[in-house]
Amino acid sequence: MRAPQLPRLLLCSIVASVLVPAPAAASSPELIGLERALSTLLAERPGDYGIAALDLRDGSMVSVNGDTSFPMASTVKLAIAATYLAEVDQGRRSLGDMIVGRPAAKVMELMIIRSDNRATDQLLATLGGPVAIQQWLSSQKIPGMRMDRTIAQLLRERGHLADSKDVATPVAMVTLLSKLDDGTVLTAQSRTFLLELMSRCATGTRRIRALLPAGTRVEDKTGTLDGITNDVGFITMPDGRRVAVAVFARGGRDRQPVIAEVARVIYDRFADSMRNALALFLQMR
């Protein structure tokens, strides 16, 4: 017996929903100037860059190629950490659980601070592999981000510049960062644990942190593959405001210095807005 056919109009609408790309990520009106400054900077640099920066206080965002997918490399380890910590919060796991002879807390420390790939795959195996991370991302409604392979599998394969697996858009990454920060997916205790590890990231001294004023608090996670250089995380502004930042770089050269320049441009724009607001307040007194 033949299965009933979908009405033609319904079938066409389903196909269209799959094939039509999502609307381009747009910068907030008040940050168009910052978008232009970043675009001008990147126009003079070889390679492809994707940037998103989200003000966690008021929700304003700047985006350059923010809806373009880039290989995540080791920045995916934040999603792995979040998946494990969410299960800790649900009482299903503990940071004291032993994973290949070490407490889970130590394994996660190696994964985030040192970007240890073996520790990452050990934690990932405990969770059930990449499919478990993808299920968690889907449950949190974070489109534009996917995990397909273990780190060992990822490193064995070539062609990272054109890879369509294990990718994220900059906007998807700052969406994940926002959820990690605002308490919607992690308890305060788990959030504090993860951010403390990110603040000690040992692989990012030449990226987001490099050109920021001394003493600026940064919590980040880097990612590196052949031809791929990434850094994502949080910058705390002088007024306490926090900005989630994702910078993905593909191809070209001198990618680390460019990421540092991008971070400084973002920092200066948000710092200027703080100073301008203070000046206006003083004038109105």
Each language-model region and where it sits:
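Conserved catalytic neighborhood of penicillin-recognizing serine enzymes
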Residues: R93-I133, L161, D166
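Active-site SXXK
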Residues: G59, F70-I99, M111, V245
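Bacterial N-terminal signal peptides that target proteins for export
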Residues: M1-L11
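Soluble periplasmic/extracytoplasmic beta-strand elements of cell-envelope proteins
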Residues: G50-D55, S63, A79, I112, ...
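Structured C-terminal helix/loop/strand segments within mature extracytoplasmic catalytic/sensor domains
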Residues: S27-L41, S69, T126, T175-T205, ...
